[in-house]
């Protein structure tokens, strides 16, 4: 409604941007791909265009904005203020989404893929029945972010007293996110209540993997501290590369291992002892390092990344087409962000 049917590519990017904040990009793409397909068919646009815009929107906030597991783990590891990390992440990810939309229109538009949607947009709306209103739909996402933001402001101002303590408690990430979960559960239609337990079980299963990765990343960081490689990395920190150091390290892990979350957590663990040496010990400096690692973890989504195959398979792309659309786009997004961060770091 806001952007209109003519700007449906922008709508897909914006939809991905919002959905990627609390949801893994892989899961978000699977859930939203029927809408992408239906919009592509309705607007007579190549499915590759819609898929690229959606993928980029999801990827930007997945890599940069807590409470997605990777960014929130980085913020905790590096001691970055969570509220400030969310605010900066939301702002920095906007240029990344714009890059994704431009890439979709200029590059992915050369890839012709028929949408062949099983449902029209109207049929999808009818299939899901009456859905919650706009405010209700956004509440489980926005309320935790607002609570975390208020807690950060209280901390910065050094406020004390009962009210300050209440907001500090409610703004703790675990508490704020739990409130969001309860809000979401409260909006489940009666006929779907029977599925609640299976959804919770699936969520616990997914989070267990993240906890294991976080723990392994921390342990790996401690191992690296005891190895000669740490001295090499510290030497790299004195080369004047500044904000590019965490970006480069994250790129190496991303390209070699494929998983953005693993690249983020591992790089954050390596960067901990280098923060003061590199001059990133200030609150904003720590957040910039989180953003730089997030940008590096974007470069680039290719064949060893599960997200690459999710996007290609659910968008009917051939492998070479996915390299052109997905890999090229994610590389452009990450490079754009690090250049922006470099300019900002000159004034911090």
Each predicted region: which residue ranges?
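Re-entrant/interfacial helical elements at transmembrane boundaries that shape
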Residues: 1, 27-39, 68-78, 115, ...
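Short amphipathic alpha-helical coupling elements at transmembrane boundaries
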Residues: 1-4, 34-42, 126, 198-206, ...
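Hydrophobic alpha-helical transmembrane segments of multi-pass integral membrane proteins
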Residues: 2-35, 211-217, 238-278, 294
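Transmembrane alpha-helical segments of multi-pass membrane transport proteins and ion-pumping complexes
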Residues: 5, 9, 17, 21, ...
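Alpha-helical transmembrane segments of multi-pass membrane proteins
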Residues: 5-20, 43-63, 81-90, 94, ...
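Juxtamembrane and boundary regions of transmembrane helices in multi-pass small-molecule transporters
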Residues: 43-45, 80-129, 295-348
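Transmembrane helical segments that form the transport core of multi-pass membrane transport proteins
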Residues: 147-257, 261
């Amino acid at each position: 409604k806001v952007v209109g049917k003519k700007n449906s590519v922008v709508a897909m990017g914006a939809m991905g941007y919002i959905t990627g904040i609390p949801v893994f990009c892989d899961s978000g793409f699977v859930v939203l791909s029927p809408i992408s397909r239906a919009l592509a068919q309705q607007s007579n646009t190549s499915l590759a265009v819609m898929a690229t815009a959606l993928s980029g929107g999801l990827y930007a906030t997945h890599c940069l904005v807590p409470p997605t597991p990777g960014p929130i783990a980085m913020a905790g590891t590096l001691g970055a203020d969570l509220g400030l990390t969310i605010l900066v992440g939301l702002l920095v990810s906007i240029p990344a989404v714009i890059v994704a939309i431009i890439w979709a229109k200029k590059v992915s538009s050369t890839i012709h893929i028929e949408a062949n949607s099983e449902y029209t947009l109207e049929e999808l709306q009818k299939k899901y029945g009456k859905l919650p209103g706009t405010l209700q739909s956004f509440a489980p996402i926005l309320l935790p972010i607002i609570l975390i933001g208020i807690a950060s402001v209280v901390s910065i101002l050094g406020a004390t007293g009962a009210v300050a303590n209440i907001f500090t408690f409610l703004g703790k990430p675990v508490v704020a996110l739990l409130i969001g979960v309860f809000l979401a559960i409260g909006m489940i239609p009666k006929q779907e209540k029977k599925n609640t337990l299976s959804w919770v079980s699936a969520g616990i299963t997914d989070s267990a993997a993240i906890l294991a990765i976080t723990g392994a990343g921390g342990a790996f960081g401690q191992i690296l501290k005891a190895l000669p490689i740490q001295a090499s990395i510290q030497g790299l920190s004195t080369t004047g590369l500044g904000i590019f150091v965490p970006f480069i390290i994250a790129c190496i892990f991303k390209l070699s291992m494929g998983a953005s979350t693993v690249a983020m957590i591992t790089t954050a663990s390596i960067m901990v002892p280098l923060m003061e040496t590199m001059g990133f010990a200030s609150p904003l400096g720590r957040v910039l390092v989180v953003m730089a690692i997030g940008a590096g973890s974007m470069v680039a989504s290719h064949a060893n990344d599960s997200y690459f195959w999710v996007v290609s398979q659910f968008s009917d792309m051939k492998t070479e087409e996915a390299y052109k659309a997905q890999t090229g786009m994610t590389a452009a997004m990450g490079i754009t962000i690090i250049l922006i961060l470099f300019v900002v770091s000159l004034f911090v």
